[in-house]
A protein has these predicted regions:
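Ligand-binding face of N-terminal immunoglobulin V-set domains in extracellular IgSF glycoproteins
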Residues: 1-9
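Beta-sheet entry/capping signal
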Residues: 6, 19-21, 117, 124-126, ...
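Aromatic-Pro/Gly-enriched surface loop or interdomain linker
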Residues: 8-140, 396
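Short loop/turn segments at secondary-structure transitions that flank enzyme active sites
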Residues: 13, 26-29, 124, 153, ...
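Short secondary-structure boundary/capping segments
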Residues: 36-40, 163-165, 184, 188-200
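Helical hinge/lid and interdomain linker segments adjacent to catalytic or ligand-binding clefts
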Residues: 103-190, 369-371
């Protein structure tokens, strides 16, 4: 008999001393708002490999349709829902809500793992949302030495894409603590940023497909769908690209040879070379899971990038994303599942950008769920703390 009303408190416009900004992915929260997939999805059990655990809010949404739908559901006529708003009760974006797509947490309540850890580590952090980036752009981001994501910033507008790109090129240090990020094009209503539009067609791992001839957004008239369709694969911002998903048990990382190089070794102080990283966690029992991103030079990974670690041991619930399946043939392992497909992995990637900037990508949606293990004394927590502390320092990185 309890409920929570989430809200985000911005810092004062002047006078904040924080060097770190955490960007809350409110676009993605709107996209998943009231999706009720545990009831509405005909493939829920196939995707997760388990019987859905219904929450009280799922049952409420099933009885009272007036709370509206999310962009992962369809109307009665089969048309995909492509408009969402936050100006209503969003019952699945609440602390303690267990989402059908995750072994435990998803979106807001998974991001709270990170907020908890940042406070536990005594980092001074300012909170901003996607809407703030939409309004203020790179001028807001430039106030911070380090800008960080939550665990699943899947939806990004063109304005925000440019803001993050410009921040990186102007010396900003960017931490992508997620997977399947900056994947779908979205647009906010020009007169009301509380309303989001997405159109899913052409390609992509998606819940529905827009009708032919209707791929362009109503809000800005531009082509919707994947950012890859506009020549802006997420590799261009993050160095990694969405490769696989498995809504089941998670796995761990092993260090790669690049992690021993002088440019990278400082991040791994206190972590053994053969030590599994993140073979524990609150989301699927591991740091590498749900959705995974990989290094891919063909899609835009910078040639100067270092692969610090890669995940392994994923089971056959992990499948290849549809946009990477160009030709289906029996025995083609690149269309296969986790146990046979070498592309089923998460790569921790690091590279430097102009003006002493840098990007690090952890490439897993369950990464942040491993921070608190063993009372915060673990190698995921240690690696994150080393990176943030190093990124906050003035002058060139090693």
């Amino acid at each position: 008999n309890e409920d929570y009303i989430p809200f985000f408190v911005r810092p004062p416009k002047e006078g904040s001393k924080a060097k770190i900004a955490l960007i809350i992915p409110t676009n993605s929260y709107m996209a998943y708002a009231n999706d009720n997939l545990s009831v509405n999805s005909v493939v829920a059990q196939l995707l997760t490999g388990r019987v859905p655990l219904l929450q009280p809010s799922d049952l409420l949404l099933n009885d009272y349709r007036g709370y509206g739908l999310g962009t992962y559901t369809v109307y009665r006529d089969g048309w995909g829902v492509n408009i969402s708003s936050r100006l209503r009760p969003i019952l699945n974006m609440r602390p303690k809500y267990i989402h059908i797509l995750s072994p435990s947490l998803w979106q807001l309540n998974a991001d709270l793992h990170f907020v908890d850890w940042l406070h536990e580590m005594n980092f001074d952090v300012d909170i901003h949302t996607d809407e703030d980036i939409q309004k203020e752009g790179v001028e807001l981001l430039k106030k911070y030495k380090v800008v960080m994501t939550g665990h699943h910033p899947e939806y990004i507008t063109e304005e925000a894409w440019h803001a993050f790109h410009d921040y990186q090129m102007q010396g900003g240090r960017f931490m992508y603590n997620a997977a399947n990020g900056y994947y779908w094009i979205c647009a906010l209503h020009p007169d009301n940023h509380n309303i989001l539009e997405v159109r899913k067609g052409d390609n992509g791992t998606r819940a529905w497909t827009i009708n032919p001839g209707e791929y362009c957004n109503a809000f800005d008239g531009k082509h919707g769908g994947l950012w890859r369709v506009r020549g802006r694969d997420m590799c261009k911002l993050l160095g990694v690209s969405f490769t696989s998903f498995g809504l089941t048990y998670s796995s761990y990382y092993k260090r790669s040879p690049d992690s021993e190089l002088s440019e990278c070794a400082w991040m791994f102080e206190g972590i053994g070379l053969d030590e599994p990283i993140g073979d524990f966690g609150l989301i699927g029992d591991g740091a590498a899971g749900l959705e995974l991103d990989r290094y891919d030079l063909e899609k835009g990974t910078p040639h100067r990038a270092f692969v610090l670690a890669h995940s392994e041991g994923h089971n056959d619930m992990f499948v290849t994303v549809s946009e990477d399946s160009t030709f289906h043939a029996r025995g083609n392992i690149l269309n296969g599942t986790g146990e046979t497909n070498p592309n089923t992995r998460a790569d921790i990637l690091y590279y430097k950008t102009p003006n002493d900037g840098a990007v690090i990508s952890f490439s897993s949606m369950t990464w942040l769920g491993s921070l608190s293990h063993n009372k915060y004394d673990n190698n995921v927590s240690r690696l994150m703390k080393n990176v943030i502390t190093g990124f906050m320092k003035d002058g060139p990185l090693p």
